[in-house]
Amino acid sequence: MTYENSTVNRWHENPDSRLRNGGDTIDAHQPRVATLCHSLAAHMGHPLIGSDLLLAARNHDEAERVLGDMPAPAKARFPELAEAYAIAEREVLRGMGLDWKLTAKEEQMLHLCDKLDAHMFAVSRGVTGQERDEARALINVMSDKFKAREWVAAQMGANQ
């Protein structure tokens, strides 16, 4: 585990200056995701004892300290590059002693909370428009898998 402050900025390639210059780092983002995962697990009655969910949530972007952050649009446009990056991320994380095992359900929970945090950060910066609406639609689809739409709404309401 590293203890220095992160210089890994999130949103660094985003065309919206409110996000690009918003000051969000992985050191701020990862604890928020862990908090959301903890809350979602409690809402769902999902046991955390024996689970690596919070470890993964708290450290899921640590490889970016070594590799940098690959923007989501680049991952979407070049899936083969995204897969190579994912392999490199896993290798770097293992080298840091961060090797967790998640169930498929926990992977989905982590993904939902990661996207939800990004959406809430964008909302907090006043971002509107199609990209925000698309993110909200994705979050709704994901939250429906867990019957957690009310939970998502409560999290977003607490963030307003």
Task: Give the residues covered by each predicted segment.
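Active-site-flanking alpha-helical
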Residues: 63, 67-68, 121
